[in-house]
Amino acid sequence: MIDALYNGGLNLVAQSWWTGAVWPVLWNLLKIVAIVAPLMGAVAYLTLWERKLLGFMQVRHGPNRVGPFGLLQPLADGLKLLTKEIIQPAAASKGLFVLGPVMAIMPALAAWVAIPFGPDVALANVNAGLLLIMAITSIEVYGVIIAGWASNSKYAFLGALRASAQMVSYEIAMGFCFLVVIMVSGSMNLTQIVLSQAQGTMANAGLSFLSWNWLPLLPIFIVYLISGVAETNRHPFDVVEGEAEIVAGHMVEYSGMGFAIFFLAEYASMWLVSILGVTMFLGGWLSPVAALDFIPGWIWLGLKTFLVVSMFIWIRATFPRFRYDQIMRLGWKIFIPVTLVWLLIVGGWLLSPWNIWK
């Protein structure tokens, strides 16, 4: 579908060599806007949904003053942050201080280029899409480190050090989760990973949700979800910005839009981790049962992603913050050994007569 739109636009401007040469660049800009604009809207309203859901879980009202049912609260928050003065510490490294937030949010937005929204709907149908996303998202930690170092604050620097150690630790476990999914799917292409989950005895019987990867790879799915919470520095793994000890971590010296960009990067990463988990383990745009195939795939993808994101919020409302040593122990002594063992189990499973992914 994306290719058809591109070719149609190219034919319209082909009469002029100048517009024909400009069209590919313009098309890429249009695709970027088509992803970034809705994503920023989803990120803004995720903050409202989080506050509403936390309010419900704590038996209180969430934001309900700005607009009907508080629906304009994200716009009010954004306007407030836009009007705040941006203050740089006198001893901060000026250029790097500005670069930090940009480096934090760019990977969270750029990784969406390889996410498929349907069998023929992806900005870039990359054969090594999963590898590309891993490479892009691994850059995000540099934004945090740069912000912590450039702030010239001991609290910010301590938060940056914690962030780098935590994100690198859980990236290893997530990498092994990706490797297991690649093994059972036989591809790093995210579209092919989704299509591989539409095969099998249960899918043929109309119960597609029982053929998705979450069931045979349940331990890997659980490790991925918890590692995703840690990767996005969400509660209970938010010691990077632990309010009770290091104030706001690497963001302590930021105000106005600098702080807002870090905030947006965190929530954009939540959406990315959620939709990636849905793509790898929950069938992507596939309907759970054949009787519901008439519902468009993008609705299923959005609904599943919304449920996974809501799980992030439920975890925040339920669990206390872990100590830093507990977080490191969980990553290195539990998740990495578990994923390595399951890597061997799945390898043997694929070579056995009981291989269900044939």
Swiss-Prot record:
It is an enzyme of class 7 (translocase). Pfam families: NADHdh. Its main location: membrane. It is a multi-pass membrane protein. GO terms for cellular component: plasma membrane. GO terms for molecular function: NADH dehydrogenase activity; oxidoreductase activity, acting on NAD(P)H, quinone or similar compound as acceptor; quinone binding. GO terms for biological process: aerobic respiration. It catalyses: a quinone + NADH + 5 H(+)(in) = a quinol + NAD(+) + 4 H(+)(out). Keywords: Cell inner membrane, Cell membrane, Membrane, NAD, Quinone, Translocase, Transmembrane, Transmembrane helix, Ubiquinone. The chain crosses the membrane at residues 29-49, 95-115, 130-150, 167-187, 209-229, 258-278, 295-315, 334-354. It is found in: Cell inner membrane. NDH-1 is composed of 14 different subunits. Subunits NuoA, H, J, K, L, M, N constitute the membrane sector of the complex. NDH-1 shuttles electrons from NADH, via FMN and iron-sulfur (Fe-S) centers, to quinones in the respiratory chain. The immediate electron acceptor for the enzyme in this species is believed to be ubiquinone. Couples the redox reaction to proton translocation (for every two electrons transferred, four hydrogen ions are translocated across the cytoplasmic membrane), and thus conserves the redox energy in a proton gradient. This subunit may bind ubiquinone. This is NADH-quinone oxidoreductase subunit H. It comes from Paracidovorax citrulli (strain AAC00-1) (Acidovorax citrulli). The gene is nuoH.
